[in-house]
């Protein structure tokens, strides 16, 4: 059976919120990194789908304004955070700083991008109010640079 990195992570010992380099892949000169942007404590809480979906849209646009080389930002199936796939090498500090900036933008935003039936496959399932509330929760707790101990 194939090994899946996220299934090997001990979800009982991590301490969210945090940013974690979850994997790298090298092919010739091309380097791809996968980051775990964990917002909520696994097996304790989960983002409601409206908040998760809205945060996905806001992160998709605003993180690309902060960082170069983003390939994709996708919600985790467990609804506790997001995976971000990027070209080239970055530091967790760089990712955290960008995420803090973006979550502050989320708190102050009034418009969710790409919420029409043409642009979004589930355009009715959004909650800007909830996205803002969860952004505040994450910022209030602080985003750690380590998944197992709080390094703020």
UniProtKB/Swiss-Prot annotation:
InterPro entries: LuxS_sf (IPR037005), Metalloenz_LuxS/M16 (IPR011249), S-ribosylhomocysteinase (IPR003815)
Keywords of this entry: Autoinducer synthesis, Iron, Lyase, Metal-binding, Quorum sensing
Molecular function in Gene Ontology: iron ion binding; S-ribosylhomocysteine lyase activity
Binding positions for Fe cation per the UniProt entry: 53, 57, 120
Gene3D superfamilies noted in UniProt: S-ribosylhomocysteinase (LuxS)
SUPFAM superfamilies: LuxS/MPP-like metallohydrolase
Enzyme class: lyase
Cofactor remark from the record: Binds 1 Fe cation per subunit.
Reactions mediated catalytically: S-(5-deoxy-D-ribos-5-yl)-L-homocysteine = (S)-4,5-dihydroxypentane-2,3-dione + L-homocysteine
GO biological process: quorum sensing
Subunit structure: Homodimer.
Function (record text): Involved in the synthesis of autoinducer 2 (AI-2) which is secreted by bacteria and is used to communicate both the cell density and the metabolic potential of the environment. The regulation of gene expression in response to changes in cell density is called quorum sensing. Catalyzes the transformation of S-ribosylhomocysteine (RHC) to homocysteine (HC) and 4,5-dihydroxy-2,3-pentadione (DPD).
Family statement: Belongs to the LuxS family.
NCBIfam families: PRK02260.2-4
Name of the protein: S-ribosylhomocysteine lyase
């Amino acid at each position: 059976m194939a090994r899946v990195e996220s299934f090997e992570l001990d979800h009982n010992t991590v301490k969210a919120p945090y940013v974690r380099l979850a994997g790298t892949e090298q092919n010739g000169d091309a380097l791809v990194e996968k980051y775990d942007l964990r917002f909520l404590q696994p097996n304790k809480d989960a983002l409601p789908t409206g908040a998760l979906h809205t945060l996905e849209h806001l992160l998709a646009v605003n993180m690309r304004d902060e960082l170069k080389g983003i390939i994709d930002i996708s919600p985790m199936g467990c609804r506790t955070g997001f995976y971000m796939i990027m070209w080239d090498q970055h530091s967790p500090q760089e990712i955290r700083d960008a995420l803090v900036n973006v979550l502050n933008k989320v708190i102050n935003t009034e418009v969710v991008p790409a919420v029409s039936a043409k642009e979004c496959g589930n355009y009715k399932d959004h909650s800007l109010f909830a996205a803002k509330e969860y952004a505040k929760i994450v910022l209030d707790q602080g985003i750690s640079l380590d998944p197992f101990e709080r390094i703020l």
